[in-house]
Amino acid sequence: MKKTALFAAVAAMLVGCGSQPDKAEQESAFDKYNSVVYELNVRQATPEGTFAAAEEYLPVLKSMGVDIVWLMPIHPIGAYGRKGTLGSYYSISDYEAVNPEFGDLAAFDHFVDRAHELGLKVILDWVANHTSRDAKWWSEGHADWYVLDEQTGVPIVQYDWTDIAKLNYDNADMREAMTSAMLFWIERGVDGFRCDVAFEVPIDFWQQAFARVKEINPDVYLLAEGEKTFLHD
């Protein structure tokens, strides 16, 4: 209940602090370069922590002037080396599945459909740099899809991210699997991606993957985490 009250209070403050767009403005063509993006943590947004519960707040977000709902990673979280009891959203075990804590794919689809009915776009937080250390790809025997420590033969750890395994972008099969996973979500109606640590992934991968994504959705919304100039290409 406290989270619900906090959400309502923040929404009320934001609505009160800014003028509401009139009908003509709301019906004007979408401008991706001047859009309002709202980051949504499914687990924390509601007491239930589910897609279905978060869906109930979509009209509130619309009334706040939000254009795009950016979902923090929605995928299953790895168990091996998990940080804390809940784990990090950015330690993904399966790119083509949803975290069962949030619901199933049908619930996710319903969330996206409702957002679209309200004129909202939905983008996913996409973690292309690494997976969890017990990810589906690793369990399936694709060791060559990872950057391995020469002495131990296990995936390297970057920074203090001890729960992740760095992906090997010199491997064409891994690149194809990553692109295929992105297409999976675009075909389900997702409107784009916020690309986590985009600067750690080769620019030619982004260019190749997005060329294929745009074959399905030419107006895909892309947001990169990083200040490197090559990310603007």
Regions found by a protein language model. Name each.
Residues 77-79, 203, 228-230:
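Surface-exposed, flexible loop/turn segments at secondary-structure boundaries
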Residues 2-8:
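Sec-dependent signal peptide recognition
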Residues 123, 192-198:
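Short catalytic-loop micro-motif centered on adjacent basic/acidic residues
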Residues 199-207:
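An alpha-helix initiation/capping motif
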Residues 211, 226-233:
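Noncatalytic carbohydrate-binding groove/subsite architecture in carbohydrate-active enzymes
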Residues 14-16:
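C-terminal motif of bacterial Sec signal peptides marking the signal peptidase cleavage site
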Residues 128, 199, 228:
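Short, glycine/acidic-enriched loop or turn micro-motifs at the edges of active sites
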Residues 20-67, 73-188, 208-217, 221:
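Substrate-binding/active-site clefts of carbohydrate-active enzymes
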